[in-house]
UniProtKB/Swiss-Prot annotation:
SMART domains: PQQ. The keyword rRNA processing does not apply. GO terms for cellular component: outer membrane-bounded periplasmic space; plasma membrane. The chain crosses the membrane at residues 22-42, 48-68, 77-94, 106-126. Keywords: Cell membrane, Membrane, Oxidoreductase, PQQ, Quinate metabolism, Transmembrane, Transmembrane helix. GO terms for biological process: 3,4-dihydroxybenzoate biosynthetic process; quinate metabolic process. It catalyses: L-quinate + a quinone = 3-dehydroquinate + a quinol. InterPro entries: PQQ_b-propeller_rpt (IPR018391), PQQ_mDH (IPR017511), PQQ_rpt_dom (IPR002372), Quinoprotein_ADH-like_sf (IPR011047), Quinoprotein_DH_CS (IPR001479). It comes from the Bacteria. This is Probable quinate dehydrogenase (quinone). It is a multi-pass membrane protein. Gene3D superfamilies: Quinoprotein alcohol dehydrogenase-like superfamily.
Length: 790
């Protein structure tokens, strides 16, 4: 009866799929399975024969449709194979019911099929890398004079390397144990429904102090070798949504200022902090309520010589900027003696009238700002009283980078509001949106701009800190470059001096949609000279499910949507964006290996369905009904435009992404060959599963990653930003997982590493407040080091 029921489901669903122009397999398999089930209920051996033939043809179809890819084959074959075992076991009884010889062949067939099912289940517990790694470069020892001393910037260096010249923990011994400083509980648990507080911190380390910030911008200093709290500064910034602090800035007045060395740089302005004055060493934080705050790194006291009691109001000059329309979640950038801050705008599909995306650099004392207003780039002065910076212009919400030799800041720009409707965008919006922008750090003057998406209608804003590398050329020389990953899965390598691509970028024709007066770009860039991560052009055969049934439902949903590839423009019908606005690659950024010319990228692969709803319809009225700002999913009003929008993740009935795994990977990109050296799935379903139910199974399917990576000269890449509760270390040469340490809750943070001057031990530190979408929350900071020798 069960077989007949499943056959009926396949028959009905298959008929719908076939009517949409999809595969006929499910209709035919449903017909055969239903017939077989009825015959088996009637105790007719012909039912087993019918199912046997159908299963044999299913094997042929599965190999034709999916090739030898493991997870697609599991989805197509596991349920039919399990039924085949039951049918084979029933064969003797069916024969006996007709007084026919039974034989023993059926039991042998059932045994073989059962072993195949068991082998398939066993295969779920081993990784299936999309690109297998070979023996890569060996370790290069850190020269004595090059040992890293501090992790004093968000990306370790001002250029966002996320690389540590440390090798005490290395690929031959890299199995550290949890120890001091942690677990430490800073006392602020980030409880969130996905739209509120999240711990997404990358700490700083300077000397014997580790610096933290909480989602409400409270600042904490810990002893780097014991984890003891040294001081705490309560800021208690508030906002109605999106509370997070991803990092901090640091400045030391006793450190020598860098001297720009390229031709014709502007000078770095000198600053003086009196001996004995507070804040000779200072921490900077942007806040979720729109302030830039400076405190003494030694004591936590506010810096009296900076702004008003160490605080600068970043909403000044913006015009109307009510909560939560102006927030800052990424760290300020200390560029020489200029502190540069961008801003996060509340979800850019809420309304057209939003605070502008001005980028400002604050000097020491008195506070003055030099900035770039993307709506008025030639005027770098603050607006006069009663006026404001141009509204709704492209913003910078991700971390920024700095090259001291050029005295240049590199900004990853977002888009103007709103994300999905561009009919009213200006020429300057088109110039700056979704671009890398290079500015003079002292004056704010523009040096160059390079755009990665034209008239962005997908929320493909640049999400990460640009990383500064020396890019290997074919002749063995190196060119100073900027490398950045995008939500669209592209990796761009740009000349640091000119902004011109160092690898091939091709403009490809793209289609528009049916939105009136939209300024559709006829072409979009693809960075074809570098690997593209997770950007496969989906077909019906790429649809997946935990079973063949939900795979069929995903196929039906896919065929009901308009999909034309990466740049499928939103319209009034339901369209699919893959990868969607979640990425691709996101704010965790790239990590680099400058010794071996490799970069490492983690990604997520989540499609979104999108539908623009004309404002004069009842559906649009429903879409404008008080949605929470910044959720980014569901119905969003697009106030000020002729449309509302409805969008959400492209998931199966079980809450699983509809395309085949992996859903998150870690990739090593060889800059010399400009190819993927290895790519492995990251994360298991141990702490999550269908409907949010934990499966408690370490199945390495590859889960969406959110958070950064850390590479070391010890030949390791660390990552913790998965849906399960682990910090992992991978061999940077092969992609093999060498170690994982269990965390009390998940982490969205970026790992850092340093050597304590007191203990001489290398620590890897991670902040763990809970994985995204996970109800398990905490406030842990955990350090790992090699066990003491006994």
């Amino acid at each position: 009866m069960l077989i007949a029921l499943v056959g009926l489901i396949f028959l009905l669903g298959g008929a719908r799929l076939a009517s949409l122009g999809g595969s006929w397999y499910f209709l035919l398999m449903g017909l055969a399975t239903a017939l077989a089930g009825v015959l088996i209920v009637l105790r007719r051996p012909a039912g087993a024969l019918v199912y046997g033939v159908a299963f044999a043809l299913t094997l042929v179809w599965a190999l034709w449709d999916a090739g030898l890819e493991f997870w697609p084959l599991v989805s197509r074959l596991m349920l039919p194979a399990a039924f085949a075992v039951l049918v084979a076991l029933a064969w003797p009884a069916l024969r006996r019911s007709r007084a026919l010889p039974t034989g023993r062949t059926a039991y042998g067939v059932a045994t073989v099929l059962a072993l195949a099912v068991v082998a398939g289940i066993g295969g779920m517990f081993v990784p299936h890398p999309p690109v297998a790694g070979n023996a890569g470069p060996g370790m290069t020892a850190v020269p004595p004079g090059s040992v890293q001393q501090n992790w004093s910037a968000y990306g370790n260096t001002d250029g966002g390397s996320r690389f540590a010249a440390l090798d005490q923990i290395n690929r031959s011994n890299g199995r550290p144990a949890a120890g001091s400083p942690g677990p430490t509980t800073p006392g602020e648990i980030a409880n969130s429904d996905g739209n509120g507080a999240e711990d997404q911190l990358t700490p700083l380390q300077v000397g014997e102090k580790v610096f933290l910030c909480t989602p409400h911008n409270n600042l904490i200093a810990l002893d780097a070798s014991t984890g003891k709290q040294l001081w705490r500064r309560e800021i208690n910034a508030t906002s109605s949504v999106w509370q997070r602090c991803r990092g901090l800035g640091y400045f030391d007045a006793d450190a020598a200022l860098p001297a720009p060395s390229v031709a014709n740089p502007s000078p770095i302005a000198a600053v003086t902090v009196a001996q004995g004055a507070n804040c000779r060493r200072r921490l900077f934080t942007n806040t979720i309520d729109g302030r830039l705050i400076a405190v003494d790194a030694d004591t936590g006291a506010f810096c009296q010589g900076f702004g008003s009691n160490g605080q600068v109001d970043l909403k000044a000059g913006l015009g109307a900027a009510p909560d939560p329309f102006y927030q800052l979640t990424s760290p300020p950038l200390v560029a020489g003696t200029t502190v540069v801050g961008g801003r996060t705008r509340a979800d850019d599909n809420v309304q057209t009238d939003m605070p502008g995306g001005v980028v400002r650099g604050s000097m020491w004392s008195p506070v003055r700002s030099a900035g770039l207003d993307p709506g008025n780039p030639h005027d770098r002065q603050a607006p006069a009283a009663g006026s404001s910076y141009v509204r709704s212009t492209p913003n910078v919400w991700a971390p920024m980078s700095y090259d001291a030799a050029m005295n240049t800041v590199f900004l990853p720009l977002g888009g103007p509001s709103t994300d999905l409707y561009g009919a009213e965008r200006t020429a300057l919006d088109h110039r700056y949106g979704a671009s890398v922008l290079a500015l003079d750090a002292t004056t704010g003057a523009e040096k160059w701009v390079y755009q990665t998406v034209h008239n962005d209608l997908w929320d493909f804003d640049l999400p990460m800190q640009p990383s500064l590398i020396d890019f290997p050329n074919q002749d063995g020389s190196h060119t100073p470059a900027v490398v950045i990953g995008t939500k669209a899965g592209q990796i761009y390598v740009l000349d640091r001096a000119t902004g011109k691509p160092l690898t091939e970028v091709r403009e490809v024709p793209v289609k528009g949609s049916d939105i009136a007066h939209e300024q559709y770009a006829p072409t979009q860039p693809l960075s074809v000279g570098m690997p593209q991560i997770g950007t496969k052009h989906l077909t019906e055969s790429d649809m997946w499910g935990a079973t063949a049934m939900d795979q069929m439902l995903c196929r039906i949903a896919f065929k009901q949507m308009r999909y034309e590839g990466l740049y499928t423009a939103p319209g009034t019908d339901v369209s699919l964006s893959f990868p969607g606005s979640l990425g691709g690659m996101n704010w965790g950024g790239l990590s680099t290996d400058p010794v071996h010319d490799v970069v490492f990228a983690n990604d997520m692969r989540l499609g979104l369905w999108v539908q623009m709803i004309p404002a004069d319809t009842r559906k649009a009225e429903a879409a404008g009904g008080g949605e929470a700002v910044n959720t980014g999913m569901g119905a969003v009003p697009l106030k000020g435009t002729p449309y509302a929008v409805n969008k959400n993740r492209f998931l199966s009935a079980l809450g699983i992404p509809c395309q085949a795994p992996p859903y998150g990977t870690l990739s090593a990109i060889d800059l010399k060959t400009r190819s993927i050296a290895w790519q492995v799935p990251v994360g298991t379903v141990q702490d999550t599963g269908p409907f949010g139910i934990k499966m408690h199974l370490p199945i390495p399917i590859g889960m969406p990653t959110l958070g950064g990576t850390l590479s070391t000269q010890g030949g390791l890449v660390f990552i913790a930003g998965t849906q399960d509760y682990y910090l992992r270390a991978f061999d940077s040469a092969t992609g093999k997982e060498l170690w994982k340490g269990r965390l009390p809750v998940g982490s969205q943070g970026g790992p850092i590493t340093y050597v304590s001057h007191k203990t001489g031990k290398q620590y890897v530190v991670i902040s763990a407040g809970g994985a995204r979408q996970s109800p398990d929350r905490g406030d842990y900071v955990i350090a790992y080091s090699l066990p003491d020798a006994h």
